[in-house]
Structures are given as C-alpha cells and as structure tokens.
Curated annotation (Swiss-Prot):
Disulfide bonds: none annotated. ATP binds at residues 32, 71, 159-164. The gene is clp1. It comes from Aspergillus fumigatus (strain ATCC MYA-4609 / CBS 101355 / FGSC A1100 / Af293) (Neosartorya fumigata). This is mRNA cleavage and polyadenylation factor clp1. Its main location: nucleus. It comes from the Eukaryota. PANTHER family: CLEAVAGE/POLYADENYLATION FACTOR IA SUBUNIT CLP1P, POLYRIBONUCLEOTIDE 5'-HYDROXYL-KINASE CLP1. It is found in: Nucleus.
Amino acid sequence: MSLPGLELSQTSSEREFVPAPPTQITLSKGSEWRFEVAFGTAIRVKLLAGTAELFGTELAASQTYTFSGTKAAIYTWHGCTLEVSAGDTISTIDGLGSGGLNGEGARGYGAGGCQSEYTAEETPMVEYANVHFALEAMRQEAKATGKDGPRVLILGPENAGKTSVAKILTAYATKVGRQPIVVNLDPAEGMLSVPGTLTATAFRTMMNVEEGWGSSPMSGPSAVPVKLPLVYFYPLQNPLEAEGAVYRPIVSRLALSVTGRMAEDEDTRETGIIVDTPGILSAGKPGSLEIINHIVTEFASSERLYSTMMKNYDNKPTSSASAAASDERITVVKLSKSGGCVDRDAAFMKSVRESQIRTYFFGNPIPSTASAALSMSASSTTNITLSPHAQQLDFDSLAVYNYTIASSDEDEDEYDPSQFGASDTFLPGGRNDAEGPETKHAEETSFTSSVPGLGGSSGDDAASGSSAVPLKKVLPPAPNTLANSLLAVTHTAPNASPAEIRDASIMGFLYVADVDSEKGKIRVLAPIGGRVPPRAIVWGKKWPGEVVGLVG
C-alpha cells in the first residue's frame, strides 16, 4: 500500500541485482575456458560432464566452485561441459570491487558476470605435461640411485604465468603420490601467507581449486587438508633493494631449511623442489643476474634471459653451498607462454594483497558449495569465518624493528611528529638526550650472518660481508605511521642481533588497528588469543605497507 502524493511505491533507482540464468559452456578436447572475475563479485562453476582441471587440480563432477577476484583457466584433456552462473556479491576491505566499483558495477557481460571469458583451442598444456613426465623420470632415477630429486627453478618476466606453471607441476606431482617442496621467492604475493613473505611448503595432498595453493592451519574445519608453510619475512617489494643485501641472506636461510627437510624426509628428497621467482629478476635490471645466480647456487622468459641461462648454466655442474657436491648437470628448458596470461594492473594486485591479509585474519568470505559438500556440512554453502582477538599492548614492552632502506622508486618522508619531544629540535644534529652511548653503539655496530657454510665464497654476499644489517629498533613513542600495518612476530629473542632477527622464521602476524602515542599503547589484532610472545617483531612499513579498512 502507498500513500497518495508520496510515491512510496516506486522502485528504488538502485535495483537489486538479478542474476542471469546459468550458461553452459562446452569445451572440446585439448581446449580451455579462460575467465576473469573482479573483486567484489563471484561466479559459480559446475562440471556437468567430462573431466576438467584448474591449474592441474581436477574439478569434481557435479560440485559447484565459487571464484572471486580471479584470473584463471579451466582445461580439459578429453572434453567437458561446464555450467557457469552468477554468485553473490563479496564484501571487500573498502567495500569496493576492483577499480573502485561496487559488486554490481564490477560485473562484466560474460557468462556469470565475468569481466572477460572465452574459449581457447591453442594452449601450452602439452608442453607442461611433458615437463612433468620428464621430472617423473628424474624422480624415479633419484629413487633408484638414492640421489636428490629434480630442483626446478621457474624464471620469466612479470605476468608470464610462472606461478601457474608451478601450480600445474605441483598438482601433477601430488596426483601421482609425490610430495614436492614448493618455494615462493616473490614477496609481491604470499603463498599460504600474507604478502611480503618468502615461504616453503611440502605438498602432500591436493590443492584447493577455489583458493589456489590452499590454506594454512586455522582453528576450524577444512575441506582440503591444510598445508604447513615455513615463513620468512621480507618487508620490501623489490628483491633488488639495497642491492639484494637483505634478500640474499633470507634466501640462503630458507634454502638451508629446505635442504634440512629433504635430508630428513625421503619422500620430499626424491620428489625435489619447485621454486617460483619474482618477475623483476628477469627484467635485466642491475643486480638481477647476481640474485639469480645466488638462487641457483642455493636451490639448485625472454630470449636474452634464455640465452644467458643457457650460457651460464646449461649442462654445468650443480654447485650449492647448502648441498653436497655431485656430478649432476643443470638443464635449461624454454617453455611457451600461455595465451591466457594477462597483465595484472596495480589496482588488481592491491586487491590481491588486501584479500590475502583479510583472509589471514578473518577467513575466506567467499561462500563455497564445494567445500560444504566435501566437509559433509548440513549447510548448502559454507565459508571459513575466523575471529581474530583484539588487545591493547604497551609499546614499551615490545621490541619492534624496521628496515631502514631508502626506497629505490620513491623518496619516502620519514618524519613523524610523535617521534620528537619538545626540545629535540634544538639538540645538535637532532640527537635525543635519551639516547645513551649504548644506543649509539648498537646502531653503529656491524652484524654478520652466523649461518655456517652459507655464502662463504661470495664476496658480494651481504651475509658474509662486514656491512651492517639495515635493521633499527623503533624507539618509543609509537609512531603514528604504525597504524594499519602488519607486524611479523619472529621466533627469535627480542634482544637478538639484527642478523639473527633477519634470518628468523615467522611465528605469526599482528595487525595494528590504532596507535595512541600519548598513552604509549597500540591496539592490535592477533590470530590467536593470549599474550603476544616476547619475541623480536619486524614492522612491514614499506611492504605490504598500509592496509586501511581491515577493521572499523
């Protein structure tokens, strides 16, 4: 009923979104369906007939999978029929979808609301499968002779599909019962962790179709077995920062941990390692080849990169500081770039990072009918909701460290009014009277890596050099720029040396929701309850940087 003259019965200009009817897509043998879904929107995909896989992981028949903020492809070896429909609107950190649009505005005109979708007949999947079979032959030989399995290093420019190839090779390996160790050396994206981390994970089970690599342990049920990543924090976007002086020692420490795992686990030793690298290392920038050489030494596409790799490494003996010398030879193989590789702009990558951080603290907001079916839940859909614990901490009680490396692409202003007292401006050189000789001595002392056997023969290795580790303790009062950023809690003591803090693995992450400089307190979110462990904490100021809107 409507009141005369008020026109209350008229429909609102913001009409409720009405999804289009489901669309059936038939794929012929050896073809794939490529699709892009914006953040804030979702599509549902169901396999009606035949067989299909997403980055090597098979889709279960008659199960509905939900995708959001994804650029992916579903491939079929023998032909299949897919049903694609529109999903619910997914809330993001800022309430907006990709490109500043809300859920409905970001929907495209493709099947199910995809921004882009099409079927491709020509794919490089046969090449990738041949690589898998070649690796399997090497693994069988390693098992028969007692040697280490193949160590695969994937190199290529940005947006070339390196991570997709790593997923495919990992999925195929687990499908035949292998247990590869996957190493992510790209701090731009997290693997089973937040951005700004270098991780290594032993994959014993299948990967999650909807979540990519899968999920790390959490206090709740999981349809797919969780993975246990070893995490190191590298709070810089570019591995070439400070000429790799921070990146290389962390890579060495990660390689040492991986080598130790392989020495104790026969299954992973026979299967080998798959290493995914940052695309910037293949851009030909100064220092890139030195870091690639360091990665090859520790762990083991353009024409110029391919030629350089062939010249420097093809059929050369392996030389690893963390592994025993052998007569193994390095083989360089060039793979075709998939036509489905698309550029990911800065806005999309920002949404990817925010989504990974939000998922770490609050769980996956995407409702999944496939997960509900696999977990035999009573509900038709399910999504993993986590409840982080909020608490206030005295900043004086924390040992927070920050990397003091000037950004290579911007002149960052380090000024923060809360860091200065009323009379600090008038002291010689801006020095604080509270800083005694001990503080000055600690800042000027050089620390070197104490890891035996790592980088001992490389003169340019920062771990063995005499230069100081660029880690500085953040002194009270708490800087206002600490708000909306991540803190990495390490496994080392709060008074450890900068080299030990740099080389320490990560226990977990805190999100700083608010800073009260006057009271000397900060409000943080923690993934678990209880007191924050008394450990050294590294501030992710430069990377992943500020994440606004995670909490209200």
